[in-house]
Amino acid sequence: MDTQTLNFNKVHFVTSAPDIRHLPNDGGVEIAFAGRSNAGKSSALNTLTKHKNLARTSKTPGRTQLINLFELEPGKRLVDLPGYGYAQVPLEMKLKWQKSLAEYLQRRESLKGLVILMDIRHPLKDTDMNMLEWSSHRELPVMLLLTKADKLSPGPRNNQVIKVRQAIADLGPQIQVEAFSSLNNIGVEKLAQTLSGWYLAGADEIADNDEQEQVEE
């Protein structure tokens, strides 16, 4: 049975936080967007939610320094994580972002899925592979979006998707690879369907855990 697609344009901003200690309670289901600072993360969030300015886009990569939290409905949240891998920021600031990102990924129990974005022309950089390997170790479902797919014609685009799928095949079946373009709406519906399924699965997992705790009591 097909999962009903959530209405992502009902999303609203909740808070921005420098680290997990400033986030709301760690309950419900969160799906986080992560990627290098020039991967088109903010544009993807804006396109998914049909909110032009939900996530701020900037011509200067590395401007997203905070964990930004948005809520679709009670218990279902989207998270815009700080961009990683941009060289032209002070080392102290870069280390602070890395610590904030690592803490969220390792300790946030409500994190149930991760969308990792990469420029289709330059995928699988070292920092991208670190994210994928960590996700595989945690057995977290991942949707790898190869962004700016409009920059390639259909043949090379499909070849690049196949090449990336083959390159990460050893990391496990929980990583889904798709072409994506905010400009041409390539892959937007598939993204919405996948995330809707993750929210449903996450909510079911929480319900099962609550049931188990009641039985044990």
Curated annotation (Swiss-Prot):
UniProt keyword terms in alphabetical order: Cell cycle, Cell division, GTP-binding, Magnesium, Metal-binding, Nucleotide-binding, Septation
Family affiliation: Belongs to the TRAFAC class TrmE-Era-EngA-EngB-Septin-like GTPase superfamily. EngB GTPase family.
Stated role: Necessary for normal cell division and for the maintenance of normal septation.
Gene designation: engB
Lineage: Bacteria, Pseudomonadati, Pseudomonadota, Gammaproteobacteria, Aeromonadales
GO terms of molecular function: GTP binding; metal ion binding
Classification via Gene3D superfamilies: P-loop containing nucleotide triphosphate hydrolases
S-adenosyl-L-methionine listed as a keyword: no
HAMAP family per UniProt: GTPase_EngB
Binding site for Mg(2+): 42, 64
Protein name (record): Probable GTP-binding protein EngB
Native species: Aeromonas salmonicida (strain A449)
Domain EngB-type G: 27-201
GO biological process: division septum assembly
Cofactor annotation: Mg(2+)
Signal peptide start-end: none
GO cellular component terms given for this protein: cytosol
Binding of GTP, residues: 35-42, 62-66, 80-83, 147-150, 180-182
CDD domains referenced in this protein's UniProt entry, alphabetically: YihA_EngB
